[in-house]
Every structure is written in structure tokens, then in C-alpha cells.
């Protein structure tokens, strides 16, 4: 793995150096085998870029570059230049919610400063041949943070009221909550409608594609 970058500008410079390379080239440099597809290795692209950029956090609940307070997010892009799928941010807390508010939430911490790295994502392009795009460093604008906060508060209210199983991907304007589990047996605790403990699938917060598309469009003037 590459050494951890010491500044935001060093990190951005490194990410810019990767732009134009294929995933196959980057994997070869890192001595990592490129899988045939991402069916069993959903996080493979992120891990490959973490290696090249010197990210330290891995799956810990802190930003990928803790010293810089920056989170790394890869974003698969289609031929249209638009994101192909929603972006996972973090696992949602379903119990122990007393005293939790937007200001001290894990999701706000994760989205405070993000290094977005677009990657070709169309399935007809072999994984090894997909190119990495130009990176951008982003922090939410006042308006974006307001949108995120509003959705988060609405979703967390439903969780607190024991309505987690009633939440669908349609709830939220820019943020959605949906099950995140490799298999349906991986259950976790939550509150039921009468405050009783229930078992349910873990949930994750995801950014909707129109939100991430707007970030890219503003930066790259698509």
C-alpha cells in the first residue's frame, strides 16, 4: 500500500494521477488480481483505489483518511456521464438512539468531506478495461446539507417510532434507507411499533443518484 497522504492537496494530486488509467493497470501495479466481475467483490474497486491512495480506515466507522477527515467514494458512471447506482454511505443505527442528532451523527461525519472518484461502470466494459475518471473533492453546500439533514431526521424518526419495516427506498428526497446484508439471515436488533425489540435486516444509508449526478454535473459541467 502507498503511504498515507499528508495533506488534502497531496491526496487530490495522487487521485488525479490515477485518472485515465484502467482498473487492470492499477491492479497490476498493486499486485492485486482483477476479478472477472463484481458479483462477489462489490467493494473491489474501492479497495484498489484505497491501496493506491494510501487510505487507512478500511471498514472502521471513521473517514478513510482520518488525519484529513476525508471519505473516499467511487461512483460508477454510465455512457451518459450519470451515476449508475446509489452510493452507500454508512450503516444506520437502529437501537441506542438516545441523544443522537444530525450534528453528532455518523453519516454527517462521513459526508463532511468526500473525495469522489468516477469510474466507468457500464457492464459491457470488462472490469479490467474500465477507466478511472477525474476526482473531485466535495463538501455539502448549505442547501445540500439541509436536504440531507431533513431526510435523515425523517428516517430516524420512523426508526425511533418502531416503523423501520415500513421504510421504503422511496422515502427521502436525496437519502434513502434500505436493507444492507449479504444474506437474509444476518439479522440485527431494532424497535418494533410498541417499543419492543425485534429482529430485522441491517439498514444502510444511500445517496440517491440524482443527488450525486448534480454534484458531478456542477463540478464537470456535464
UniProtKB/Swiss-Prot annotation:
Q: Which UniProt keywords apply?
A: Cytoplasm, DNA damage, DNA repair, Endonuclease, Hydrolase, Nuclease
Q: Where is the protein found, in the record's own terms? A: Cytoplasm
Asked whether the keyword Signal is assigned, the reply is no
Q: Name one Pfam family in it.
A: MutH
- Chief location category: cytoplasm
Molecular function via GO: DNA binding; endonuclease activity
**Single Gene Ontology BP annotation:** DNA modification
Superkingdom of this protein's organism = Bacteria
Q: Which GO terms describe its cellular component?
A: cytoplasm
Role: Sequence-specific endonuclease that cleaves unmethylated GATC sequences. It is involved in DNA mismatch repair.
Similarity comment: family membership: Belongs to the MutH family.
This one is known as DNA mismatch repair protein MutH
The organism encoding this protein is: Photobacterium profundum (strain SS9)
Amino acid at each position: 500500500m502507498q503511504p498515507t497522504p499528508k495533506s488534502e492537496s497531496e491526496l487530490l494530486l495522487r487521485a488525479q494521477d490515477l485518472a485515465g488509467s484502467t482498473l487492470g493497470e492499477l491492479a497490476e501495479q498493486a499486485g492485486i488480481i482483477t476479478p472477472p466481475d463484481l458479483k462477489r467483490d462489490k467493494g473491489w474497486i474501492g479497495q484498489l483505489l484505497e491501496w493506491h491512495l494510501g487510505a487507512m480506515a478500511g471498514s472502521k466507522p471513521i473517514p478513510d483518511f482520518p488525519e484529513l477527515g476525508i471519505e473516499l467514494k467511487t461512483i460508477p458512471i454510465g455512457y451518459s456521464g450519470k451515476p449508475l447506482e446509489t452510493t452507500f454511505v454508512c450503516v444506520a443505527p437502529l437501537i441506542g438512539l438516545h441523544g443522537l442528532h444530525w450534528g453528532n451523527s455518523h453519516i454527517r461525519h462521513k459526508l463532511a468531506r468526500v473525495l469522489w472518484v468516477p469510474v466507468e461502470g457500464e457492464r459491457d466494459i470488462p472490469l479490467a478495461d474500465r477507466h478511472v475518471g477525474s476526482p473531485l473533492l466535495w463538501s455539502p453546500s448549505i442547501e445540500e446539507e439541509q436536504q440531507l439533514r431533513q431526510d435523515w431526521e425523517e428516517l430516524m424518526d420512523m426508526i425511533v417510532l418502531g416503523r423501520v419495516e415500513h421504510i421504503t427506498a422511496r422515502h427521502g428526497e436525496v437519502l434513502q434507507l434500505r436493507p444492507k446484508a449479504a444474506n437474509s439471515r444476518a439479522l440485527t436488533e431494532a424497535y418494533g411499533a410498541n417499543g419492543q425489540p425485534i429482529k430485522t435486516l441491517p439498514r444502510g444509508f444511500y445517496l440517491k443518484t440524482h443527488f450525486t449526478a448534480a454534484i458531478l454535473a456542477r463540478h464537470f459541467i456535464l
